Amino acid sequence: YIENGDITVKASGTEGKNTVSQGNKKDVEDTNTIITGTSNENTVTIDTSKGNVDVTFDDLNIDASSRKEAAMSVTGSGNTTIKLDGDNHLTGGNGSSGIDSIGSLTISGGENDSLTAKGGSGADGSGGDGIHSGSLTIYGGTVNANGGNCGDGNYSDGGSGIRISSHSLTIYDGTVNAKGGNGGDGNYSDGGSGIRSNGSLAISGGTVNATGGKSGGG
């Protein structure tokens, strides 16, 4: 349960196994990692430096506004697979992403499963991205990704709904709604992109709605 403290999930180096840490429980071996519950202060960290990590989000609700960091952070070059079960909500803190991953991320779910990832609004800077990842693959479920609104700083923009920093965004099935955050009142403040990719974009199925945020008044 996320309300019991920050959760860290690491690839154990053995296929199909993770090690999970929370509070006084350190590196507990687990073959079916399910994260559930509600918290306004605790976050999830996933470490794929030793291999791939599979987790299930079961009606998970995290609002990291008080922490000023991503609700879920992923380190390492391995792949993280998130299986959705029920309705899940991840909100990043000030200027931070809902989900921030430097490696590859895979999201899957059924028709009635969903993930809403929101970037935090920037106080005097840019808003956070809903989902920021090196690469992202979506196999099903409903994924709502909303960029955070920009603050009042100059040259600051709204966050992207989905931002791919290096590789690819691939959508096979499901419904994806991506909306950029709005620009602020500072000079040269633009709205964020619904989807922003520095790599390739491939859509072979499902429904995709991408909307950019409004530009600011400066």
Model regions and ranges:
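A composition-driven surface/loop motif
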Residues: Y1-G218
